[in-house]
Amino acid sequence: MSRIRLPLILSGALLAIQLVASAYQAPVKVNRGEYFPARDNWERRKPADVGMDAAKLHAAVEFMKSHETAAPARDFSDQEIIFGKLLGSIPAERGATNGLIIRQGYIVAEFGDTERPDPTYSVAKSMLSTVAGIALDRGLIPNLDDPIANVVEDGGYDSPHNRLVTWRHHLQQESEWEGEMWGKNANFLGKEAFGGAEMKPRPIQAPGSFYEYNDVRINRFALSLLRLFKKPIPDVFRDEVMNPIGASTTWKWVPNPVKASGEW
């Protein structure tokens, strides 16, 4: 297995989580009634009101504030070194360390600018798997073990090898799909294209037999879902998931303006 991209995370986040966990005390009975946070009105509580130790919670927050990650760089100057040739736009800089601690639906701690939108890379995989679930529920995907070539006819699954790729393979990152997306090959070879994430040559395995964390194949999966819905996947996610659950409206999926060989 190989991992080629890590999401934006706080350095030392695991230790911080341990600190927060240690701040938890015995449950305190609170007469909360029926409560579900509104989109822009999450209620706040003191740590003691939800069974947390205020001093330990404060220590956890201070730890996180003082352990900002060094990667990516604030100005994203290291992105091509890490990931290779960039596709699409990227902000001039990222925000500083920030976060929320929520218990029982209430905000008990907040630090930094939590309303600033910042790039979050691998969250796309969770988004796409959710959209795939909607497609399955609607019957757009009859069966997760069906070959994608049965319903997607854009040339991306025409080869004998790719015709074996199923929806489950993409969802489990075991597709071994062969091809290019926006000028980047799924084999992840080449320093210019992939930077420090480039891989060593290896034999391609049968779909479903080898796991690989591979962004090119995730992009192919996203395009295949678009073919089913016949509209941008971010629109599907907004209309079917984010708006119904009352999520914030500040998020966005930044489109890729690059036109290159391999764009089906």
Where are these regions (language model features)?
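Flexible glycine/proline-enriched surface loops and loop-helix/loop-strand junctions
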Residues: 42-43, 201-207, 217-219, 255-263
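Conserved catalytic neighborhood of penicillin-recognizing serine enzymes
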Residues: 155-184, 199-209, 216-219
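Active-site SXXK
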Residues: 53, 105, 119-144, 170, ...
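N-terminal leader/targeting segments and the immediately adjacent pre-domain N-terminus
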Residues: 5-8, 13-113, 138-142
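Catalytic tyrosine of NAD(P)H-dependent dehydrogenase/reductases that use a Tyr as the general acid/base
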Residues: 121, 211-213
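Solvent-exposed loop/turn segments at secondary-structure junctions
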Residues: 106-108, 114-115, 177-178, 218, ...
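Active-site helix/loop module of the DD-peptidase/beta-lactamase fold
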Residues: 138-176, 229-264
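Short, charged, amphipathic alpha-helices and their helix-cap/turn boundaries
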Residues: 99, 106-107, 149-150, 173, ...
